């Protein structure tokens, strides 16, 4: 299991509002796919077009409710630009894309409400490498899989060969595997 990280030290997380003609309001609740809330005191969230920052979210206290993020996205096109999200660890500076989540910019539009924010799920993906040595096959090919994905690996030796174990020393076959946060090579 290998973890892929998308990060760029060159990301600029500021926007000059006078550089843009149009804006859009977003009210967001950002969580990890497993249900854990993103700690807004530890992370920034921003909207991007390519590598250009188009808005940085601020924490919006909601009376009697859970805080959400308010983000004012900006554009010079009235509509149609596809914007993506990134989040940044305030302590380490590490930046990651929020993969497979985007929105179409529309001037004066709103996405979500303070009382019902738009849900943004951070799904962490890992490159899962499954290979064979000698003669045989494995029923799963691996690939880029979401954290928490369950696999049931079955090693099938070719005629004249036998299964001796996985590269981590386990001899369980079939072998259940849940894609986690630690690197594992099988």
Language model features with spans:
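Extracellular Ig-like/FN3 beta-sandwich strand-entry sites
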Residues: 80-82, 148-150, 183
């Amino acid at each position: 299991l290998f973890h892929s990280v998308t990060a760029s030290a060159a990301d600029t997380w500021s926007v000059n509002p006078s550089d843009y003609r149009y804006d859009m309001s977003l009210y967001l609740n950002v969580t990890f796919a497993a249900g854990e809330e993103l700690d807004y005191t530890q992370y920034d969230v921003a909207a991007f077009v390519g590598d250009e920052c188009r808005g940085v979210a601020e924490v919006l206290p909601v009376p009697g409710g859970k805080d959400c993020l308010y983000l004012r996205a900006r554009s010079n096109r009235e509509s149609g630009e596809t914007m993506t999200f990134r989040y940044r660890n305030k302590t380490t500076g590490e930046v990651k894309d929020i993969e497979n989540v985007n929105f179409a910019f529309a001037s004066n539009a709103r996405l979500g409400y303070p009382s019902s924010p738009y849900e943004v799920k951070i799904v962490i993906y890992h490159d899962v490498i499954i290979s064979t040595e000698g003669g045989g096959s494995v029923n799963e090919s691996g690939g880029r899989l979401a954290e928490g994905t369950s696999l049931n690996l079955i090693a099938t030796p070719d005629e004249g060969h036998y299964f001796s174990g996985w590269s981590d020393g386990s001899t369980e076959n079939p072998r259940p595997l849940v894609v986690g946060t630690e690197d594992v090579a099988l």
